[in-house]
Design a protein with these regions (language model features):
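Short, surface-exposed acidic
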Residues: 32-36, 117, 164-175
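PAPS-dependent sulfotransferase catalytic core
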Residues: 1-70, 177-187
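PAPS-dependent sulfotransferase catalytic domain
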Residues: 71-168
């Protein structure tokens, strides 16, 4: 039977979307990615993206072939969710402490104006959550990055339940590497 859903991992940049794609891949769920953005010191296990993360432009102009990826997970950042055409979606939305996200971004590209950026990131997260709640063609689960690091098996079991038991949880857990959790902020 052909899968009727388009599956998406989403969230702000640096929120753990690549980690979740790795979890799904290791757990045996079909994922779609290419080699357009190779691993580097910021994501040593890879980005697991299509088209170097440039899907949003194609969603905006209606040229992204969503039907081609039915039944597979793809990664689309939070901003891109507003451009999803009508369909049938299951979305894993990753959240992470905004200060940790900004710490990670600064390590990648240098200083940012936190007083300006933090409210924008918070607003984008709220916007994405409202969109997920509002659209009747989207089923979603929110996964906290820190919870995956602290208790990977429990969180991956929760994701597995959302996906109807299609993951090999023990294999998926192996994708989580707490050593890569480098931008820690105690709450």
């Amino acid at each position: 039977m052909e899968d009727e859903y388009n599956y998406i991992v989403s969230g702000l940049e640096r929120s753990g979307t690549s980690m979740m794609m790795q979890i799904l891949y290791r757990g045996g769920f079909p994922v779609a990615f290419d080699k357009s953005r190779p691993p580097n010191e910021h994501n040593p296990k890879g980005y697991y993206e299509l088209e170097g993360g440039k899907i949003i432009n194609r969603l905006m102009d209606g040229t992204f072939p969503m039907e081609k990826y039915r039944g597979k997970f793809i990664k689309i950042t939070a901003y891109g969710l507003k451009f999803l055409p009508k369909g049938k979606y299951k979305i894993i939305y990753m959240v992470r402490n905004i200060d940790e996200i900004m710490d990670s971004m600064e390590k990648m590209s240098g200083p940012i104006d936190r007083e300006v950026e933090k409210p924008l990131f918070e607003k984008l997260n709220r916007f994405a959550m409202r969109l997920l709640e509002k659209r009747d063609d989207i089923e979603y689960i929110v996964v906290k990055y820190n919870d995956v690091i602290k208790n990977p098996k429990k969180e991956i079991e929760r994701v597995n339940e959302f996906l109807g038991g299609r993951l090999d949880v023990d294999s998926a857990v192996q994708a989580v590497d707490p050593k890569l959790y480098r931008n820690v902020r105690e709450k």
